[in-house]
A protein has these predicted regions:
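Extended alpha-solenoid helical-repeat scaffolds
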Residues: 1-242
Length: 242
């Protein structure tokens, strides 16, 4: 009944008050409905409303994010897409803080498709940081913990994000370089390792940074030489992944 009432309200009136009331009704249903198909339909209606009435969802973004509690990955994906289209300077800090908490939750093995969900969250936060650079400094150090993620996509997204932050915020470089040196020996994916090496070679400047970087690289490589006298691989640490 509430769904039909909201749909009727949208059909009969295009006033801002009517659209806001309908959107609030949809969001309330989104958070209380138990059927995943119903949630997906409601998300589609909210997307339509946002497209027709730009800005209407900005005050409801935090309520929409409650739908992330659903274990269904498609509901999570549609919710994040809707939120990214509705984020604004007024709510971006709150949005990013909530998404950061969700990222930390994905470390639990109890979360279904945790690696895929973590990748979605990291990319969502990355997009927010690109559009609103002021939020980047509040989350970048948390992200560094995921450079050793076994999910290559997540780790790669984090490394690309770190590289962008270093490029745009020179004042943050030293701290991030130190964290990167700490994380380097734990990185598992070769693609992530390559970007990390590029970042170190590009932004390391002081003798202290050079010394720490070289020590981290040596630790990551393992005992030398990497190849024995007859071409056999020694016990040196290999970085895996694609």
């Amino acid at each position: 009944v509430r769904y039909e009432s909201a749909a009727t309200l949208v059909a009969l009136s295009q006033s801002a008050a009517a659209i806001r009331a309908a959107a609030a009704c949809y969001v309330s249903l989104l958070c209380t409905a138990s059927d995943n198909n119903v949630k997906l339909i409601i998300l589609d209606r909210l997307v339509d409303l946002r497209q027709q009435h730009d800005g209407i969802m900005q005050d409801l973004v935090m309520d929409v994010l409650r739908a992330l509690s659903s274990p269904n990955i498609e509901i999570k994906r549609k919710t994040l897409n809707l939120v990214l289209e509705s984020v604004s300077p007024r709510n971006v800090v709150e949005v990013v803080q909530l998404l950061k908490k969700e990222v930390l939750k994905t470390q639990s093995k109890e979360i279904e498709k945790g690696a895929e969900y973590r990748t979605m969250l990291i990319r969502a936060i990355h997009q927010c940081a690109v559009r609103y650079p002021e939020v980047a400094t509040s989350i970048i150090h948390v992200f560094m913990d995921f450079l050793s993620d076994s999910a290559v996509t997540s780790a790669l997204d984090v490394m690309v994000f770190v590289r962008e932050v270093m490029e745009k915020y020179p004042a943050l470089r030293h701290g991030l370089l130190m964290r990167l040196c700490e994380a380097l020996p734990t990185i598992r994916a070769s693609r992530v390792f390559r970007i990390a090496l590029w970042v170190l070679s590009e932004y390391v400047e002081s003798p202290e940074e050079v010394s720490l970087s070289m020590a981290a690289i040596r630790e990551a490589l393992g005992p030398l030489p990497l190849v024995g006298l007859r071409g056999g691989v020694t016990s040196g640490r290999a970085v895996g992944g694609k």
